[in-house]
Amino acid sequence: MPNSTDNQGSAPPGLSSRPLPSSFDDNADFYNENGFQKVSRRLREEPLIPIGCIATVAAFTGAYRAMRRGDHEQVQRMFRARVAAQAFTVVAMVAGSWYYAADRQKQKELWKLKEQQDAEEKRQKWIRELEVRDAEDKALQERLEKRRKKKAERDSAAGAPDGVAAQAQAAYADAKEKVSSPAGDVAPEDPNKSNITGVRERLPTWLGGSKGADGSSRDKN
């Protein structure tokens, strides 16, 4: 249970200026009483009130029995005793109320303060729960962001070799097109080769000359 200093710090403005009783600071049972315990404590604090009540009941019972027996004198004595017991009970109640007025006022303040502390504890628990949920949401968002970044890095790393290979293939195809001539183009004729062919045509066949279309040699004198 928090001490009186903490209680005063969280008390409302009307209660913070008043010192709280130190006899209840460390008494946890005072704050956790049920109805029977509360009545028992009140009886221990003001024992004259239950004594006066018991005396009143006893006097009334004695008067009833004397009336049944027909003893009128005893009936009168019991009624006077009942009145005296009731007066004693009233005096005990007034005296007890006056004697315990300050403590009861402090008890009311303590009960109000306890209710405020319970409400504040609930509010703090609610705030802490919201903070924990917010932290969990942020951690989840960070994990998802890291996963997205790693996936993007893996995709970029896997796509880089494919791009280089495509560029290499395109360069190789361009070079191949430049080296090879296109279909239907005639390669340039070598002039030395044409001169040799003309000389061979002028030589006779027995000297290695070429034959004509009809198989005859081309002899030119």
UniProtKB/Swiss-Prot annotation:
Q: Coding gene?
A: rcf1
Q: What name does the UniProt record give this protein?
A: Respiratory supercomplex factor 1, mitochondrial
Q: Where in the cell is it found?
A: Mitochondrion membrane
Subunit composition and interactions: Associates with the respiratory chain complex III/complex IV supercomplex.
A Gene Ontology biological process noted in the UniProt record is: mitochondrial respirasome assembly
PANTHER family in UniProt: HIG1 DOMAIN FAMILY MEMBER 1A, HYPOXIA-INDUCBILE GENE 1 HIG1 -RELATED
Name where it mostly resides.
mitochondrion
Does Iron-sulfur show up as a keyword for this record? Answer: no
> Which source organism does the UniProt entry give?
Neurospora crassa (strain ATCC 24698 / 74-OR23-1A / CBS 708.71 / DSM 1257 / FGSC 987)
